[in-house]
Amino acid sequence: MKLKDYFKKQYEKGLWSMETITLIYMLFTTILIGIHRQGLADPQGMVLTRVLMLALMGVMYGAYRLYPCRALRIARVIPLLLGLIFWYPETYDFCSQYPYLDHVFAEIDQTLFGCQPALLFNKVLSSTFWSEAFNMGYYAYYYMMGATILFYLFGRYNQADKAGFVFLASFFLFYIIYEFLPVAGPQYYFKAVGVEAACTGDFPAVGYYFQNHTEMLTPEIKGIFSKLVIGAQEVGERPTAAFPSSHVGMSTVTMMLAWKTRNRWLFWVMFPVYLLLCCATVYILAHYLIDSICGFFTAILFFCFTSWLYDKLHPGYNTERD
């Protein structure tokens, strides 16, 4: 498709399914804000975030109505994807209203594997090469997802509505789990109880500890990618979203979407990065091994469910290439 064709007037009625599912998620979490408002640090700010997002979506839709073209319709997707950056930290605000369950998941790892894989993995592969390789994979998370969604928008436009729905709906399903299942992950839990205690198999319950404590273990910086990952965690990470791993889960959903494009270059270029990313979730202490394993299988379940749901809601959907 030529560049000028993206600006040719052509009105497509209705919302993106991504817009609809975002509005539903915003409504759902607004109800949660109302329920937990007494325990939340800044419920007014959370509501304001939703008002601003709604206003931005309205402005983007209004611009499209004034000059309907494919370029502006694609542009409407941008705030939906950027919204994930704001919705993620809120899972901590919600889940910290409940006692944390890290002792349960650390015990599961100990029972299944006879050790704490998160503590041993980076000791077994401690060289700068492996540290940088795994951190590179972890840091590529958002770039992989962004590349896949952009490929659909510009290379498989007629399939983009379904792909975007599957992607965002799966993300929101993970977020909903996190809002009710408080698990901080080993980088926070082992900092709280002590690495020595974890190595000896002592996993005390910490209750509401993470309501007021967000300190985490900081691994040694061995190169540019480990520095980038640590910097990103310092800015946006919270004691939340450990089980099941959305890094494994959503990268798996992304790989399945990439496969569905039938563009093998897209899939196979990302595949080794995907493997490094999955390993990195345990290597950098972000997840217990059971988190990552369950993240993989949860992704398959969510992908199948959201695909089925989309087909039910859009029985006449056109899946031809464009």
Enumerate the language-model features and the residues they cover.
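Interfacial segments of alpha-helical transmembrane regions
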Residues: I74-P79, G146-L181, Q187-G201
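Hydrophobic, membrane-inserted alpha-helices
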Residues: F28-I31, L56-M60, M144-I149, G249-M256, ...
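Membrane-interface helix-boundary motifs at transmembrane edges
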Residues: Q10-Y11, G39-P43, A63-A75, Y152-K162, ...
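Central hydrophobic cores of alpha-helical transmembrane segments in multi-pass inner-membrane proteins
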Residues: R50-R65
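Membrane-interfacial catalytic/cofactor-binding modules of polytopic membrane enzymes
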Residues: F180-K260
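Membrane-embedded catalytic cores of phosphoryl/pyrophosphoryl-handling enzymes
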Residues: G223-D322
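Aromatic-anchored segments of alpha-helical transmembrane domains
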Residues: Y25-G34, G83-Y88, F171-E179, Y274-Y283
